[in-house]
């Protein structure tokens, strides 16, 4: 999710190489989760909770879901219930995989990971509240493209 990469860029100094490495790691985790039980999202979330005190489900529940739904529905017309379930599942999976990679690969401290999660929630709130200023997901993607040279292929047509 570009929002997570944007937060890492703004607040933790991640550049192109680290963002791409994180994205690849998350994709590898997703592929491995298909065949390895210890790589399933629920297993990794339990590891984060028990070993590091990071309760991903609790953190996801703190995300202002109504705001996230409105942001998402600006470009994706789905029913509220479909959108809510999709976003909840996506946010849970992404946050679990990202936090696992940030801890194990990038050696971020628990404090830094908790800050990342809080900043992620704050960015969602900002996107929702300040829509009148034109801060949108495609603009976040454009910022990553311009400043970090990271391009999310989902936004190529939107940006051009």
Describe the predicted segments one by one:
Residues 1-8, 37-104, 133-160:
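Intrinsic disorder/low-complexity detector
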Residues 22-33, 114-127:
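Amphipathic alpha-helical segments that form the core helices of the histone-fold
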Residues 129-131:
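Short, highly charge-biased, low-complexity peptide segments
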């Amino acid at each position: 999710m570009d929002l997570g990469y944007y937060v890492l860029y703004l607040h933790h100094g991640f550049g192109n190489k680290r963002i791409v490495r994180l994205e690849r790691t998350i994709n590898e985790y997703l592929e491995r989760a298909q065949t390895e039980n210890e790589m399933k999202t629920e297993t990794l979330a339990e590891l984060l909770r028990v070993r590091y005190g990071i309760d991903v489900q609790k953190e996801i529940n703190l995300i202002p879901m109504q705001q996230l739904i409105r942001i998402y529905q600006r470009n994706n017309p789905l029913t509220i219930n479909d959108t809510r379930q999709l976003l909840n599942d996506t946010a849970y999976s992404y946050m679990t995989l990202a936090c696992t990679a940030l801890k194990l690969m990038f050696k971020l401290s628990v404090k830094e990971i908790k800050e990342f999660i809080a900043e992620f929630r704050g960015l969602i709130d900002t996107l929702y509240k300040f829509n009148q200023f034109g801060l949108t997901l495609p603009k976040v993607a454009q910022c990553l493209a311009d400043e970090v040279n990271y391009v999310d292929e989902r936004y190529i047509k939107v940006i051009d």
